[in-house]
């Protein structure tokens, strides 16, 4: 049986939200049938790199994604020239996904997925450029995915998209009385009220 290799395009595989979601899928897919490889935009190794390679994934490195950089675009196109084996590209670069998707389209990659993980972008100096790049995503992608309605509506406007719920290994969150007692002992909490926060503050 031929193994299908899917190219996941990310900034780097640190322990962020979308990276953790990807790893949750990656750990449980049938890797005899489907393999994930990763195109990252950092030269240094990241938190999940060892695990990816242990599961048979390849990691390719490009310079930082700068949409107006001739050096970046040259490196991106060279990558696709050298790797015609990829027939599915799954891009997680928010508004700048269009840069990769357009190159993939020009290299006749038949399945080009844009995946929205946010309902907004930082309003910094690059914000107008990101909004301009966002407009062409539906034209360059063959499939539009979002983690939720807000993320899909913001990224894709009126274009039709599919919501892909983030994968979570629920067994990691199963209540365990022994762990509760031990952790409270380690933290010196005894029976005090503890208020927890799950998520980020940004």
Show which residues each predicted segment covers.
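Membrane-interface segments of envelope glycosyltransferases acting on lipid-linked substrates or membrane lipids
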Residues: 1-202
